[in-house]
Amino acid sequence: ENVIEHKLYIVHRLDKDTSGLMLFAKNRITASKISLLFSTNKITKYYIAATNTKFNKNTDTLINYNSDKKQLKLAYRKIQLDNHENCYLIKLFTGKKHQIRLQFYLNKNPIIGDKKFSGNKFNKLLLCSYKIIFKLYGKFYKFKINPNKILS
């Protein structure tokens, strides 16, 4: 915090072991507006995950239900990344807690390092918040990171 000149406000959360992109705002009003965009699904979120096995299809939409009977929906597409054979670009349509991890597990393709759903003992969960797109104050914003640096 000593390096940053502004107080920062967290505008969304990531699951504990998920790595990658997070957004912060420099003032409370903007933080509140961005948080509202997240809670009303007006922000497009993309993640990248690596698995030990592959899905039957290279691209698909998964629809499942969590223990509260709430619908979980995501789309995935197989992509090529350094160091991992089975990587997927994931677009979230709903944003429930542990959603990607749960849906991959329910569809028999758990994420590497997911101790909660797969018992996999790899030292790091290979799930990364990769890209966030939204419109605010009449402007479009797109933030993304290099997933090869995170999923190594």
Question: For the regions a protein language model found, what residue spans apply to each?
Answer:
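RNA pseudouridine synthases
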Residues: E1-S152
